[in-house]
Amino acid sequence: LIFPHHENEIAQSRSAFGHALMAKYWMHNGFLNISGEKMSKSLGNFFTVHELLDQFPGEVIRLLLLSAHYRQPLDFTHDGLIQAKATLDRWYGVLRGRDVAPSASVPQAVEDALSDDLNTPLAIGAIHQLGDPAALRAGANALGLLQQDAEAWFRWTPAGASGPTEAEIEAAIAARQAARKAKDFEESDRIRDELKAKGVVLEDGPKGTTWKRG
């Protein structure tokens, strides 16, 4: 990079947003590519963060961005977003139904990875190896992940998506539970299958029935 690239970046940002301190650290990351091509308005492959947030939770976008080292280019794809969502679904699944607070300290393997020139891909790999829910939450929290309640995570809905409301889903679950209590398993299965066809998956467990959109 040579002058005047990034000239007056702090002055511009402070004037635009009215904050005395925009950031403590400044880094220049690798190119952001979209399906193998550099993102640009001229190529028509440009989209905004707000547009992405209509389709995916913010943590999905964050995880995909962290999946590449900041010095390296990142190929940002829809498949990558789907994979990041699946990863977070697995992690939140570990926390679901449990009152899990993060452990007091960041797991050593995660801390070591971040101390190695912010090696976020290595840190993500270390998080995958954590079996203890409290350690999992602490390690993910260090990357700004697993910040939500697990139930809220699984009930997130994309903007403009069709499907039953939470109240309608809860009413259907109550009707299904009544059918099961009456040993009307045909009706119970019908309600479950109807919800599944509408994009709602039921999961029966020791503490009752939970649901998620998927």
Task: Outline where the language-model segments fall.
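Generic alpha-helical secondary structure signal
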Residues: 59-63, 105, 167, 171
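Basic, alpha-helical terminal appendages of large translation-related enzymes
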Residues: 124-214
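Alpha-helical recognition segments enriched in aromatics with Gly/Pro capping
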Residues: 1-99
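Short coil/turn segments at secondary-structure boundaries
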Residues: 25-29, 64-65, 78, 101-103, ...
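Short, contiguous acidic/charged loop-to-helix segments that flank catalytic cores in large enzymes
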Residues: 78-81, 114-117, 160-164, 178-179
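Helix-loop elements that line ligand-binding/catalytic pockets
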Residues: 73-74, 80-147
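Short, hydrophobic/aromatic alpha-helical segments in well-folded domains
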Residues: 9-12, 48, 109, 113, ...
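Short helix-capping and inter-helix turn/linker motifs at the boundaries of alpha-helical repeat units
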Residues: 39-40, 101-105, 163-167
